Swiss-Prot record:
Signal sequence extent: 1-22
Keywords: Secreted, Signal
Miscellaneous remark of the record: Transcription is induced by mei4 transcription factor.
Principal place of residence: secreted
GO CC terms: extracellular region
Organism of this sequence: Schizosaccharomyces pombe (strain 972 / ATCC 24843)
Gene behind this protein: mde1
Compartmental location: Secreted
Protein name, entry field: Mei4-dependent protein 1
Tree of life domain: Eukaryota
C-alpha cells in the first residue's frame, strides 16, 4: 500500500505535465483600434510608438521617433539617433545617455543634460483594448503634436495650432511593461499587491494593436 506522501507525489507527477502544457497554450485576440500604428523603436529600455488618426497620413517613410540636434523628430533622417528611454523609480523618464527630456507645454521636446525630472510624462497602466499588451503614455495635456517644419516633422508637447504649418495630434505609446525579461522573451504575469495581474507581451517585435 502506498504511503500518503508517496500517493501525493504520484498524483503530482501525473497531473503536473498537463497543467504545464495547458499553461503555454494561450490564444490572444486583439481588437485593432482606429489608428495607424507606426514603426516601433526596439531597445532594451522603454520603447515608444506614435499613433495617428485614420484620417491623417504622413508622407514620410518609417516614421521613427528619434532625436537629432537635441530635438525630437518624427521620420527617418540620416545621421540621427533613435530615442532610448528608461523609467526611474521616482516617476521620471530619461534617455540612456542621461540626458533629460524637457517638457514645456506647447514647446518643442528637447534633450538637455541633467534634466530628467523636468519631463513630466505620466505612466498609466491602462490597456487600449482588453487584451492589448500595451501601456499608454500621455502628458498632462493628453497628447503631443507633430508639426511639419521645412520638410521635417518636429514633435511638440500638447496641442499645437499654427496657421503657418501643418500640425497633427499624435499619441506616444509604450510597448513594454516594467520587469520585461529579455533573456527568454517568454510571457509572464506582473502581479502587484492590490492590483489585477497584467500579461506581459510575447516579444519585443511589432504587435498589431
Amino acid at each position: 500500500m502506498l504511503h500518503a506522501t508517496q500517493l501525493c507525489y504520484l498524483l503530482l507527477f501525473c497531473f503536473l505535465p498537463i497543467s504545464i502544457s495547458s499553461a503555454v497554450l494561450i490564444e490572444r485576440e486583439i481588437n485593432v483600434p482606429t489608428t495607424h500604428v507606426l514603426q516601433t523603436l526596439y531597445t532594451r529600455f522603454w520603447s515608444f510608438k506614435a499613433h495617428l488618426g485614420v484620417d491623417m497620413e504622413l508622407g514620410i517613410k518609417g516614421s521613427l521617433i528619434h532625436y537629432r540636434d537635441d530635438k525630437l523628430f518624427l521620420g527617418e533622417y540620416p545621421k540621427s539617433r533613435l530615442l532610448r528611454v528608461c523609467y526611474d523609480d521616482n516617476g521620471t523618464f530619461k534617455v540612456k545617455d542621461k540626458r533629460g527630456l524637457v517638457y514645456v507645454q506647447g514647446e518643442r521636446l528637447i534633450l538637455e543634460r541633467d534634466a530628467p525630472s523636468k519631463f513630466s510624462i505620466e505612466l498609466v497602466e491602462e490597456r487600449r483594448e482588453p487584451e492589448s499588451p500595451y501601456l499608454l503614455f500621455f502628458s498632462n495635456s493628453s497628447r503631443f503634436s507633430a508639426c511639419e517644419e521645412s520638410g521635417e516633422w518636429v514633435i511638440y508637447s500638447g496641442d499645437v495650432y499654427s496657421a503657418e504649418t501643418t500640425c497633427i495630434p499624435i499619441e506616444l505609446v509604450g510597448l513594454r511593461y516594467r520587469g520585461w525579461k529579455t533573456n527568454d522573451k517568454k510571457p509572464f504575469r506582473i502581479i502587484e499587491p492590490g492590483k489585477e495581474p497584467l500579461d506581459a507581451p510575447w516579444n519585443d517585435e511589432l504587435i498589431v494593436m
